[in-house]
Amino acid sequence: MARDFPLERVRNIGIAAHIDAGKTTTTERILFYSGVVHKIGEVHDGAAVTDWMAQERERGITITAAAISTSWQDHRINIIDTPGHVDFTIEVERSMRVLDGVIAVFCAVGGVQPQSETVWRQADRYSVPRMVFVNKMDRTGADFLKVNKQIKDRLKANALPIQLPIGAEGDLTGIIDLVANKAYLYKNDLGTDIEEAPIPSEMEEEAAEWRYKLMESVAENDEELIEIFLETGELSEEQLKKGIREGVLKHGLVPVLCGSAFKNKGVQLVLDAVVDYLPAPVDVKPIQGVLPSGKEDVRPSDDNAPFSALAFKVMSDPYGKLTFVRMYSGVLSKGSYVMNSTKDAKERISRLVILKADEREEVDELRAGDLGAVLGLKNTTTGDTLCNTDDPIVLETLFIPEPVISVAVEPKTKGDMEKLSKALTALSEEDPTFRVSTDPETNQTVIAGMGELHLEILVDRMLREFKVEANIGAPQVSYRETIRSSSKGEGKYARQTGGKGQYGHVIIEMEPAEVGKGFEFVNKIVGGAVPKEYIGPASNGMKETCESGVLAGYPLIDVKVTLVDGSFHDVDSSEMAFKIAGSMAFKDGVKKCNPVLLEPMMKVEVESPDDFLGSVIGDLSSRRGQVEGQSVDDGLSKVQAKVPLAEMFGYATQLRSMTQGRGIFSMEFANYEEVPRNVAEAIISKNQGNS
């Protein structure tokens, strides 16, 4: 089957921004003008094509990155609409990994918001070329040039207006195209009747000034253009387009456009700019990967190269499991067998589809540069590489942040236990930042995610999609106990009941073990003081006592026990008697070994604008945190600290409020450390029921 569009005429783009900048409305208008939908869907009416989950339509926010294919000016445009809420960062992250270009949408009133900075950093991480659409120019307080300055100052971007608005707020009547040096005037509400006109006389001077700046900036990056510009003081429309495209692809130039998606103004010009300035798959660097030999290799965007693709999203739906893939090289055919090189597993491709949000079109094959979805994959999860069995390669994977909040979950009825388990498995397959584990001590199921809204929506999905009602508990900290000194312990169990008695007797030495050893047992019995068959039961008795600790009922770790002596009775001794004696000796010894309470310490890294550095450090210190490092780079501060997990609950919300939503943090387990005496006393007292 031949290609519908040559690779040079394919654009894989994302639409990304902060909440309420108008991303989804912009996507809806793009679909309307490019003919995918025939009626405009509004986010606030709950009718947007890309917001296809029930929760998205209710809340008016985009949660999952919906992938849609459309066409414009004889180009195929694959679009991903991404969420702006920080709890759904993984959706933006995985979009950036597979895109070639991004339209960053900003509100003309709100300008650069905290989430804009996060999204911009994610685009930087994957070196994604981008352009800007300053939306909502019809709103009171809209200021195009102010937003352009914020993008330059706060995002350190080489932002360059290629348009100017004619009028603003309720009086936005048209747009000046600085590249073509003319105006577009809107004659109807649908934005379909557009008149080309000369630049209005009252704006000629301002437009000439901005066009000169545009020519100057574009010429700076191109030797050929700078010569022409220095000689003639002018660049033609074609020369400007070529220069802007080169600047976007290579030099970090960011063209800035304006309009109002809601009022249907400026969207077709955004589509023109996508075609003119954003890269095709052949314009970006070939994807890198690692061969089985360990050698690095690249795969060019070419149908004739060996097949390789990256799974960037897994979704359950009524028809089965959909795995979204970005094709990097070669051709993937329906019914073929491929290799999951990340997991070293063979997979069969049952069906292939291209998505138009919640509608789908079945296709026989996907080619290099395509975004599509596969049905039938059993073992593939987010970040896995698919390739030919004859030409294995593992592509660079996604950066997946660690979850930062966890809570216990249980079904409201016993009968829902199995349904809950299935729901959690399906949801964790879809979302790599959603983790499920079982607490061995409480036997509770614990779910972890990127924030409270993240977990709230997942619990909501359990109810809607899997019909499971669940209770959510407060998160618990898993403390531990250990000993700080050495001692001896003795346990003698002697009972006489009727005929046969019970007798077991052991003497042990206890000392702290190396960190990470858990429970270590050494047998030093000589001369048969304790027969061999009773040594195992005595050790088991000690190990079981270890599990419930001596201070507050938490497991005892890193303890070394040496069995040195004991005695037995030919008739009355038994395995049970020695198990009880072992437990008694352990309890006797541990009390004399200075037992202490340990708590999990977390490695925490906080990123925020440097204005908030003092507040961030002060807050971490108030949480018993130890700051281990800090740096400031380009107005962004990073703080590394070690903080007790018990003090980190509610931190995501506190950080947001403290940094006006502009701070992000990651957290992972570091080690166990001793709990300060005053804190330990409160925990012990509470667990012993004295509080």
Swiss-Prot record:
PROSITE patterns: G_TR_1, G_TR_2. Residues 8-282 form the tr-type G domain. Belongs to the TRAFAC class translation factor GTPase superfamily. Classic translation factor GTPase family. EF-G/EF-2 subfamily. Catalyzes the GTP-dependent ribosomal translocation step during translation elongation. During this step, the ribosome changes from the pre-translocational (PRE) to the post-translocational (POST) state as the newly formed A-site-bound peptidyl-tRNA and P-site-bound deacylated tRNA move to the P and E sites, respectively. Catalyzes the coordinated movement of the two tRNA molecules, the mRNA and conformational changes in the ribosome. This is Elongation factor G. GTP binds at residues 17-24, 81-85, 135-138. It holds the Pfam family GTP_EFTU. One of its GO terms (cellular component) is cytoplasm. Keywords: Cytoplasm, Elongation factor, GTP-binding, Nucleotide-binding, Protein biosynthesis. The keyword Cytoplasm applies. InterPro entries: EFG_II, EFG_III, EFG_III/V, EFG_IV, EFG_V, EFG_V-like, EFTu-like_2, G_TR_CS. One of its GO terms (molecular function) is GTPase activity. It is found in: Cytoplasm.
